[in-house]
Design a protein with these regions (language model features):
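One-carbon transfer enzymes
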Residues: 1-111
Length: 111
């Protein structure tokens, strides 16, 4: 079973979260999403699926305390630059999906 920390925002992320949560061999151990926005589609999907929600800071704290352990980080349209802990702690690393050319279309709404 691959344990995933899902990081995302927007509708595409929410749809992917729903798809991943239904797959055999995958366990979503937490969802890191927009703590500063009301009505985040990813937050709504996580609540609908009964998945633990984290802010950037609460995820870091849980990782450092050993309460949040995962094999793979998956960032899909996540708005914030990740700190080293998010890249080095998971045994399989972290994958980032950004649907636009970088660096030309960097940022949260560059596509």
């Amino acid at each position: 079973m691959t344990k995933i920390l899902f990081m995302g925002r927007k509708r595409l992320s929410a749809n992917l979260l729903r798809l991943l949560s239904s797959q055999n061999g995958i366990e979503i151990v937490g969802v890191l999403t927009d703590s500063h926005l009301q009505g985040s589609p990813t937050t709504a999907a996580a609540k609908e699926l009964g998945l633990p929600l984290y802010t950037f800071d609460t995820a870091l704290e849980a990782m450092k305390e050993g309460r949040l352990k995962y094999d793979l980080g998956l960032s899909v349209l996540y708005w914030r630059k990740l700190r080293d802990e998010f890249l080095t702690i998971p045994s399989l690393g972290t994958i980032n999906f950004h649907p636009a050319l970088l660096p030309e279309y960097k940022g949260t709404g560059g596509y």
